[in-house]
C-alpha cells in the first residue's frame, strides 16, 4: 500500500485554484453515497462538491419527512479526517447540529439513537449570509476510515425541512490496492418506518 497523500494533488481531475489543499473530495466514492430522508432522490450526494462550486446552489439537499438527514459516505481507500466543512442558509432550514459516526455500515433512523456519536458539533444559533462553517475533529478518532456517517438534525425537533448546500471533508488518504468492499444500503427508506431520534440521546458534544 502506498503512503498517505492529499487527494487534491493526486486524485482530483480538476485541481483547486484556491481552497484547502488537503480536500478528500476526489477520494469519496460519490456515486455510492446514500442519503436517508432526502426529498429528491440522489440529491444528497450532489452537495459533496469541489471547492470552486461551494457557493453554487444549483444542487442542494432538503430533508423530506422531518428535519433529519443521514449521509453514508464511503471512501475509495483509508482516509484520515481532519475537519468537515458545511454550508447552510441563515433561515429555518438550517440544522442545529450534526454528529459523526466513523466506520459504521449498520446505521439508519431505527438504530442511530442507540449508538453513541464519536463527536457532535453545533452550529451558531444566528449568522448572516450563506456561511461555510469548518469544524476541526479529533483526528485520532478518524483514522483508517472506510466510511463516515454524518447525521444532521435540529434541537427543537422541528418538522421544518433541513437544507444543506455544501459538505467538504479535509484530511489525508491511502487508496485501496484492490476493489473496495461494496455495502448495500436502504437507498429509499420509508420515513414512516423511521421514527425521529430522541434529541436528548444525540446532543452530546466532546471537546
Swiss-Prot record:
Keyword 4Fe-4S (UniProt): no
Gene3D superfamilies named among the record's database cross-references: PITH domain
InterPro entries in the record: Galactose-bd-like_sf (IPR008979), PITH1-like (IPR045099), PITH_dom (IPR010400), PITH_dom_sf (IPR037047)
Main location: cytoplasm
Locations listed in the record: Cytoplasm; Nucleus
Pfam families, A to Z: PITH
Domain of life: Eukaryota
Statement: the UniProt record of this protein carries the keyword Nucleus: yes
Gene Ontology CC annotation, any one: cytoplasm
Keywords tagged on the record: Cytoplasm, Nucleus
All residue ranges annotated as the PITH domain in the record: 13-189
Recorded family membership: Belongs to the PITHD1 family.
The protein, known as: PITH domain-containing protein P35G2.02
Record organism: Schizosaccharomyces pombe (strain 972 / ATCC 24843) (Fission yeast)
Taxonomic lineage: Eukaryota, Fungi, Dikarya, Ascomycota, Taphrinomycotina
Amino acid at each position: 500500500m502506498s503512503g498517505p497523500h492529499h487527494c487534491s494533488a493526486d486524485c482530483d481531475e480538476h485541481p483547486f485554484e484556491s481552497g484547502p489543499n488537503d480536500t478528500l473530495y476526489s477520494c469519496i466514492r460519490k456515486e455510492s453515497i446514500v442519503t436517508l430522508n432526502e426529498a429528491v432522490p440522489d440529491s444528497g450526494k450532489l452537495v459533496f462538491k469541489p471547492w470552486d462550486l461551494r457557493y453554487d446552489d444549483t444542487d442542494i439537499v432538503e430533508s423530506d419527512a422531518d428535519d433529519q438527514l443521514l449521509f453514508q459516505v464511503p471512501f475509495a481507500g483509508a482516509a484520515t479526517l481532519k475537519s468537515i466543512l458545511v454550508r447552510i442558509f441563515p433561515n429555518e432550514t438550517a440544522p442545529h447540529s450534526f454528529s459523526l459516526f466513523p466506520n459504521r455500515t449498520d446505521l439508519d433512523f431505527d438504530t442511530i439513537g442507540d449508538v453513541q456519536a464519536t463527536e457532535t458539533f453545533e452550529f451558531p444559533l444566528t449568522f448572516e449570509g450563506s456561511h461555510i462553517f469548518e469544524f476541526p475533529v479529533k483526528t485520532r478518532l478518524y483514522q483508517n476510515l472506510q466510511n463516515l456517517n454524518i447525521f444532521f438534525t435540529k434541537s427543537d425537533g422541528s418538522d421544518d425541512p433541513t437544507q444543506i448546500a455544501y459538505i467538504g471533508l479535509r484530511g489525508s488518504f491511502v487508496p485501496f490496492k484492490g476493489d473496495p468492499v461494496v455495502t448495500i444500503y436502504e437507498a429509499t427508506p420509508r420515513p414512516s418506518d423511521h421514527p425521529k431520534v430522541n434529541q436528548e440521546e444525540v446532543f452530546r458534544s466532546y471537546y
